[in-house]
Every structure is written in structure tokens, then in C-alpha cells.
Amino acid sequence: MSAKGVSEKEHSPMMRQYLDVKDRYPDYLLLFRVGDFYETFFDDAREVAAALNIVLTRRSNEIPMAGFPHHASEGYIAKLVKKGYKVAVCDQVEDPAVAKGIVRREITDIITPGVTYSDSILDDRHNNYLCAIVFLRVGRQTVCGAAFIDVTTGEFRIAGLLPEDASVFLRSLHPAELLVSAADRERSETLRHALPAGTAFTVLDEWLFREEQAGEILARQFRTHSLKGFGIHDNPAGQVAAGVILHYLEETRQSSLQYITRITPLQSGDYMTLDLQTKRNLEIISSMQDGSINGSLLQVIDRTRNPMGARLLRQWLQRPLLRAADITMRLDAVDELKKMKPFRESVCCDLGQISDLERALARIATLRAIPREVRQLGSALAVIPLLKQSFQDTVSKRLCSIADALMPLPDLVAMIESAVDPEAGASMRDGGYIRKGYHQELDDLRQTASTAKERLLEIQQEERERTAIGSLKVQFNRVFGYYIEISKANRDKVPPYYEKKQTLVNAERFTIPALKEYEEKILNAEERSLVLEQQLFQALCCRIAGHAEVIQENAALIAEIDCLAAYAVCADEYGYCKPLIAEHTGLRILNGRHPVLERILPADEPYIANDALFDDRQKMLMITGPNMAGKSSYLRQTGLIVLLAQAGCFVPAEQAEIGVVDRIFTRVGASDNLASGESTFLVEMNEAADILNNATAKSLLLLDEIGRGTSTYDGLAIAWSMCEYIHRQIGARTLFATHYHELAELEGLLPGVVNYNASVLESGDRVIFLRKIVRGASDNSYGIEVARMSGMPSAVITRAKAILAGMEKRDIATPSSSGLSLQSMQISLFDEIDTRLRTAIEVIDIDRMTPLDALVELKKLQGLVRTGNII
């Protein structure tokens, strides 16, 4: 049942109030506070009940209803938002006891996947991006721009895109929520299908996507008349996207945005683009096995000490640098930290004491922080002078720059320390979090309440003596205030001037004029104290937010120090070397190792290191050899070493010289994309086409088993043709692993193609995979041996060996390579059958055949193909 299914006259006043609010927030799940519960109604109730697995009930007029206790709301809301829902919270904003008529309710918070500050929803080591993509008509062409923000850190970026690259950008960014225009339905649907699982998709009105609207809101946010100083003036579509984001934040009641102090262009020339396939195939951030961090490059490299560094490290690994000078500057800083172990350990200790400045600032600026968070921010800021002093004596260019750029805020630290009690807890309800001596009026109110409470103890003693009731007590609760409690056993001793307030099973409660007088003094002082304390705390938060730009700059520098130190720890503990970075298109890795596999091997099993050499004479390494011999690991290893080097990290190798790579493309493994109706082979061909269309001479191509998803002939032809195209048209450094041994012929036909193989050691009827990549081609795939190792029944293995021996004896399914050339590949299989088939077809008299005769003849030909005999 929807809200429209019931006449408005049938609704209660509260339900009419609910419907009025729901009309203003139709796209949100509305959580409506009713007493101690948040309730949902109509279709919202069905959604909530299903999403949270809670009971769906009904009100008196059959209205569906589902709810949960308000004290447990954070966990329930987190579950809803993680499932992609947008939630509006409608609270009671007046005391039901004093309300005249229906209790007044208002929207107090809006939470969406891209706009949340909740620790129950966020991962402190992962950014939470809200993104907008805009397609804008400029003259005769359509331009595309994107903007994305993490409201929990204040990071706000803008990017210019080619329209056809928007989907790739989204898959790479992996935002929590995407904003698009209702006017561009076709492109919006394309983007929806490109979104990673779990990303919320929000369609907004067309009028929000106007340049004038965006310009006004950006100028207002950054208090400027021109955006030229931000370097984004030449990206109109990106500006519109940024304006849409800011409007959406205002719409979702994010009114305190002063901590968002800058917007930064994401320059494509600064960073390497890693598409989703490359991230997945190289397992940079998550493993292919279960999607978790376990088994990924990030798990090995992340030795950061605080959340800011952890988030930045994820960005570094997903955005390797493209300029040799920038890479070398980062490597030099890592080198210095690696060599200075005692200094590095001291720095890491300091980093461990620094809380998440970025997210704390966002919560403080939006008045969502609790006193303990403010105190932690002050403690973190107090470490900055120590870090600045520590780095004064460093020599590498980047570390010196960091030392100069760190900006201590001693006055702000002193203010926080003087204002917030170090014992402040998580709750603000009972006050007491502002320190004594910070504000005179607050101290006076507290003193008044304290003095009055002391007088209550005196009243208690006086009444005990006056009534001779030794158990008489003066107590307090939130419902009845202060009262005198007397047990039933002493009921006959109660004086007549005692005014009864409440009767219990075993006691009665009273008040007297003196108690009323001091109760009023205490409650009045405490109420005023709580209000004043809250005002002082909010004022302190606003003062802190006024330093947002400096705090964010310090946070960025601390995160960078954390990442550099983490790199240095990896280099020191894992035995990594400092790569030499150059602008040429060569690549020289000596005794390289896979950074993840070497960490998970048993301690007594050494990792087999391998070289990777590219120069003018070696542009394409054709790698043959059996499955399980290490070909795929070798490809991934090479890609990860290049990626680490350009991310500014030392690499797992004895020596490495990296000619800067502009893109790393991978085609390693494939599976069906059932959602898009794509087969394994089509997925493979789509990925291969993307590589051929976008790779350059400065790219690194990692191609594994191209063509295996189709017939032998088709697959070999495609693989051969791709090799030729890469050699002639692209000239990229290429590792080409294949089970088509015929491709080894290319070494003699295409200059720069060089054969390598994954070596094995044969011992009787067994083989040992050595995991060593050596010069030369392989002539055996050892497929039966791999099948034996997998645990296949011995009868199957024995029969397979017999079949293979027979096929090799008759030269069946073994292509001849002598006819392969650049002009044609004339591979002849089943020569005898082909000849007989051709003869049988030639003698058929088609003109005299009836349809039935044709079917009979076709059956005979089919028998020849299947069995080698005419049926």
C-alpha cells in the first residue's frame, strides 16, 4: 500500500504530519520519531522490513509499518545506507508533555551513501566519494566533466573527461554515490550500468546542471569572483559537476561547509590511469578471490600508522606518477627514511599518536563532534611542532619541503586544552565537558548548583533529626525532581506539612517548601549551565573550523610522511631496492619478485626470482610453457614492480631501471559477464580491443593466453594478428604469455620479438615446474601432468596419455609451422580427412538431389568429419 491508497480524511493528525514531510522527501526512506521508536510507513516500511529483516506490522487502518528503537538507530541506519538507501531522519523537536496538539517534528538529519559522517558506515582507511558527472554541449561538440568530494575529509576534485571515458573513470574512482541529470537519460543509464556494485545512483532535476547556477554556488562557497586561481576555469562541465555536488550537500542539510576550502583539478598528465581490469588483474587494492584486502598489494605495502596515511596510500597505488622528476623526489625521501632507522621509528611513534585530523575536522565543522574528538584533535595538533623539528635536519628535497610547510597552531592547541576537559566522555547530555576556569559565568552557575546540593544534604540531616526517621533520604529523578523518600514502616512519623508526590509499594515520596526552593535553584542553574556549555562548545568548534585550511594542509603533509615512512619500512624489512627512473622506453628488472606471493610462501621455500629486460632489441617477450609453471605470476610481478616504482616505492628486485610507463594494460584471465550478456570470449575480446585502441609506445602490455576462449584456429589467428599489430602499430613493451607454441615462429619474423619459456625439469614420467623464466621457446605444455597434479583419477590420466601418443604418431592436432608467414598462416590439420571430404563434396550432383537425398548425404559427410569414415 502506498500513501496514495488511503484518503487523507482517514488519516490521524500524526499520519497527516508524516505524509506532509514525506511529500518533501519522496526519494528518501523517512524515519519518523514516535516516542522511543523510529517508524516507517507504507512502501518505506516494506523496504525497511526487507532490508533490515525486521517485522512488518500494520496500523489500525491497514497501513504497513516497521520500526526500531531510537537508541539503536545508528546501527540500523548504517545497514540501510550500506545497501544504497538514502535516509531522512524526522525527530520530535518539542517535549510531548508540553506540546499543544500534535508534537512538532522536523528533519534533523539526512544520510546518503555519499553524504555521511557516521563511523558505523565509514571505513577510516577508505575514502567515501560523492561524484557528479556532467555532459555539456559546447558549440558543436559535447564535453564531459566530473567532480568528486569526500565530505568526511574535505577533499574536493574536478576532472575533465572524454565522454567515452566516463564509465572507465567511474569504475576506477568507485564512488559511494553518483549524481546525474534527469535530462540525459541514455547516458545516465550507461553510467548506471558502469557503476560498481553498491554505488547509489541519484537523478537530479535538469535545472541544477546549468553553468550559471554552478558558477554562483562555487563563487559563494569559495568566496571568490573568479575560479581561475583554482585552475579549473577551462573545464566548464567539471565546474557544473562541482556546483551540482555543492547544491546536493545544501539540499541534504550539510549547512556548515566552511571546511571545504579548495577544489583541485585532477590533471591526467600527472598520474597514470589504471582501468578496472588492471586493478583487478594485478590485485592492487583487493584480491580476486574474495574481494577483500587479503592477498592484495595494498595489504603488503600498507604499513601506515594513521587513517590519513592509509587513505593516501590507496590513492598513491591507484594513481602512479608519470613524471620522472616527481617519482625520483619521492624515492629519495623514502631512501633517506630507510637509511635512518632510529629516526624513522621515532617519526612512526609520533604518527601513531595523531588521530584522524581530516575526519575530526569535518565532524567539528559540521557540529557533529563530541568533546572527546575535539580534545583528540588538539592532542594531534600538539605533535606537529615535534614533527617539524624532527625534519629540520633531513636532506632530501621532499622531506625538507615538508618540514618547511608544516604549520603549528599553538594558540589553537592551547585554547582546546583550556576549554575541553581531558576526561570528557562520549555523551554531552549531562554536561561537564568544558573545563573549570574557561568561562566565568559557567563556573558561577556550577558553583550555584553545587552550593545548593550541599544545602540539600543539610536539609536531609535536619529532617532526619526533626522526624526521628534515620532512613529518610533526599533523592532525585528526572520525572519528579528532588523529593524526600520515607519507607512505609515510618509512615506514621511523617509530619503534616510534608506534601505527598508519589506512592510506591514500600515507600512514599514527599516534598517540603525548603526542598522546593533549592530544587528550583539547582535545576535552574543546571539547565542554564547545560545550555551555556553547549553554546561554548559550538563556538569552540566554529573557532577550530576557522583554521580549516591550515589543519587540512597539515593533515595532508602528515599523511604524506606516513606513506613515505611506510614505504621505507617495506624497503627495509622486505629487502626492496631503489629503482632508477628514466624517460626512455626500456625496462630492466634483475631478480624481480612478486611482492605478494613472496610474503605468503612458507619460510623454508624461497621465491624464484626472474629478470625482465626490454630494450631496442627486446620489445615483446613471447613466453611459452606449461600451465602452473609461473607465466601469469611473472606477468603480474612485472606489472606490480613497475607500478610500485612509479608510485614512489622501492621494488622487490635486486636491481631495477624503469623507463616511465604511461599505462599498464592487462589481459589476464576472463570470466562471463552474465549481467551484460557477454561470454568469456567476448569479455576477453573487449579487453583486448581496449588495449589495442589505447596503448602507446610508452605503455606496458601484459597479455596472458589471448585467444583461448574460442577454437584453436580462431584463437591462434587472433593471437598472431595481435602480436603483429602491437609490433607494427604500437611498439609497446609487451609480455605475451601463450599456450600457442606456434607463436614462437614470430621471433624469426618480427624484430624485437624474443622467445622465453617457463622452464621445467623432467624426471622419468614426472615433471617439476622450476618457476624460472629462461631464454628460448617451449615445445610442450605438460597438460596431462597438470591434470595429474590436480587429482584426476589415474584411469583418466592413463587414457589421456594413450590418446596423446596416438595423436602425436599420426601428427593429428599438431600444426605445421613451416607454412607460417607474415602474408598468411596456412595451418593444415587432419590432412587426410580434409582431402577425402573435399573429394566427397566434389562428386555430389546437387542439381539431381531431392531434399531427402541432401540430408542423407549431409549425414555421411558428418560421419566422415566425426569418425574419419563415410557412414
UniProtKB/Swiss-Prot annotation:
PROSITE patterns: DNA_MISMATCH_REPAIR_2 (PS00486). GO terms for molecular function: ATP binding; ATP-dependent DNA damage sensor activity; damaged DNA binding; mismatched DNA binding. ATP binds at residues 625-632. GO terms for biological process: mismatch repair. SMART domains: MUTSac, MUTSd. Gene3D superfamilies: 1.10.1420.10, DNA repair protein MutS, domain I (3.40.1170.10), MutS, connector domain (3.30.420.110), P-loop containing nucleotide triphosphate hydrolases (3.40.50.300). The keyword DNA-binding applies. One of its GO terms (cellular component) is cytosol. Keywords: ATP-binding, DNA damage, DNA repair, DNA-binding, Nucleotide-binding. The keyword Transcription does not apply. Belongs to the DNA mismatch repair MutS family. This protein is involved in the repair of mismatches in DNA. It is possible that it carries out the mismatch recognition step. This protein has a weak ATPase activity. NCBIfam families: mutS1, PRK05399.1. This is DNA mismatch repair protein MutS.
